[in-house]
């Protein structure tokens, strides 16, 4: 139960993030909705890189594609690329001050958002609106909250049921 219990927490947090991603929001708030799934995947890939990798990013990316009704593989490609970069730099990133980590998160979210835009632009002509950047900024601002909550989840001791 020891190894699977920790992975269960990881999957649960990612599934919760998927719920936040597809939660119905009014048009006003929908443009501010950051990519919760990517934020959670980034956290877990930095915190426990031996448990969360490119395969998990690809898998949850495909699930996100299905849940959002986007072209199959869009999120899978974006998440895999970002998590690959995180895994390559995770030892350095863990040593950085929080502000610099947030700057890295900004660039990860920006890379994902741009990749999704370019894929959408190949599929159909897409217009780059100013609201396109809002989820990147909101996600960067939400990073301290995501980090704190997921760190608490990771370090919480399991409840014994005897």
Task: Label every PLM stretch briefly.
Residues 1-162:
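Terminal, non-globular segments
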């Amino acid at each position: 139960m020891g190894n699977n219990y920790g992975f269960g927490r990881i999957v649960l947090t990612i599934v919760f993030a998927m719920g936040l991603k597809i939660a119905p929001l009014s048009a006003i708030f929908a443009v501010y909705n950051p990519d919760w799934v990517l934020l959670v995947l980034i956290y877990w890939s930095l915190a426990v890189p031996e448990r969360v990798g490119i395969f998990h990013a690809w898998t949850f990316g495909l699930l996100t594609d299905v849940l959002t009704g986007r072209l199959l593989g869009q999120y899978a490609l974006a998440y895999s690329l970002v998590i690959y970069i995180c895994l390559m730099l995770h030892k350095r990133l863990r040593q950085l001050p929080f502000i610099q980590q947030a700057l890295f998160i900004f660039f990860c979210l920006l890379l994902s958002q741009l990749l999704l835009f370019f894929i959408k632009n190949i599929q159909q002509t897409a217009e780059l609106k100013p609201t396109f950047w809002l989820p990147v900024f909101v996600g960067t601002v939400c990073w301290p909250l995501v980090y704190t909550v997921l760190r608490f989840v990771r370090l919480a001791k399991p409840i014994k049921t005897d």
